Amino acid sequence: MTATDRTPPPLKWLCLGNRDANDGFELFAHGIYARNGALVGSKLSLRERRQRVDLSAFLSGAPPLLAEAAVKHLLARLLCVHRHNTDLELLGKNFIPLHASSLGNAGVCERILASARQLQQHQVELCLLLAIDEQEPASAEYLTSLARLRDSGVRIALHPQRIDTDARQCFAEVDAGLCDYLGLDARLLAPGPLTRNLRQRKSIEYLNRLLVAQDIQMLCLNVDNEELHQQANALPFAFRHGRHYSEPFQAWPFSSPAC
């Protein structure tokens, strides 16, 4: 498969904001588990039927204006699930992947806030899984957006793309009391040079000591095989996610236009 096969042409995304949020999309959930194996939540993704595109990566890396359209569609799907399945507990906590920079778009924040209020009527917990890969310190505007979201009942999971640098970017959010979870990708635990592994282990253990005092729990993402499971199990992760534990499932077929 070529890069072109994986990445849709930019023009295709321009129609997202104008399309009916109930047309042609499927919502998938991928389980998040506690150390004892209990299902506690789901990482959500949205797939477009006609283009056969998984929007989860798009949500994490899109420019803010396009991210707003993707958020609109995913939240519309999620609301539809809970309107028609009032006893649905399988999704648990709903983790939505989004790039932290997208919170600079007022439309994204307003869409999330409005949806959070609606989901709370169904006793549904919404959590943003915010990808962080910037070197600049967190801006006052960004922290203000986080505060608004948390005050409205939205949980925040920070997802730094590296341990040695980006994890430090989380400290402003942590110090301000604006973080509920810290997510790290299992690829950071992959075997490598001993010095690197020791440095990463010490970084993770240090982060855990820093976070546990503030009741912030750690989540290991994309644990896709037994080796990564063993690595994650040896470290203080409260929750794990990945194909080692389960495959993504379609939350609702959405074959009916009733939503």
Curated annotation (Swiss-Prot):
<keyword id="KW-0805">Transcription regulation</keyword>
<dbReference type="Pfam" id="PF00563">
    <property type="entry name" value="EAL"/>
</dbReference>
<keyword id="KW-0010">Activator</keyword>
<keyword id="KW-0997">Cell inner membrane</keyword>
<dbReference type="InterPro" id="IPR001633">
    <property type="entry name" value="EAL_dom"/>
</dbReference>
<keyword id="KW-1003">Cell membrane</keyword>
<dbReference type="GO" id="GO:0005886">
    <property type="term" value="C:plasma membrane"/>
</dbReference>
<dbReference type="InterPro" id="IPR035919">
    <property type="entry name" value="EAL_sf"/>
</dbReference>
<dbReference type="GO" id="GO:0045893">
    <property type="term" value="P:positive regulation of DNA-templated transcription"/>
</dbReference>
<protein>
    <recommendedName>
        <fullName>Exotoxin A regulatory protein</fullName>
    </recommendedName>
</protein>
<comment type="function">
    <text>Positive regulation of toxA gene transcription.</text>
</comment>
<keyword id="KW-0804">Transcription</keyword>
<keyword id="KW-0472">Membrane</keyword>
